[in-house]
Amino acid sequence: MLIRLLLALVFVIITVKPLAKVPNVLFVISDDQSYPHASAYGCRGINTPGFDRIAKNGVLFNNAISGSPGCSPSRASVLTGRYHWMIEHAGTHASTFNNKYFTFPDLLEKSGYWVGYTGKGWGPG
């Protein structure tokens, strides 16, 4: 009996995959915020210590463009990785976002990440 128990234990130890350590992903976007208006970019009139800490330990974009002059189409472009003119009504201020377009949060969730948001997930406006 003890041998069977030990064999079962060895089998379980061998077949169990170690949990893969996946990186945390934090994506933050703000509407209608001009490029230099955060202290991480050197703005002296606006104090943004939370963003500064994230920028120091993560990624700070210094050369990026908006996919569209409107906020909802820009968010839709960022979320899908497509130009706003390629995603039908999601590329406008219309209130529909067709489910046929996958977003990177959808893909992260399917990969086992916990995904959440506050504020606007997409739009409109």
What are these regions (language model features)?
Residues L2-L5, V16-G125:
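Formylglycine-dependent sulfatase
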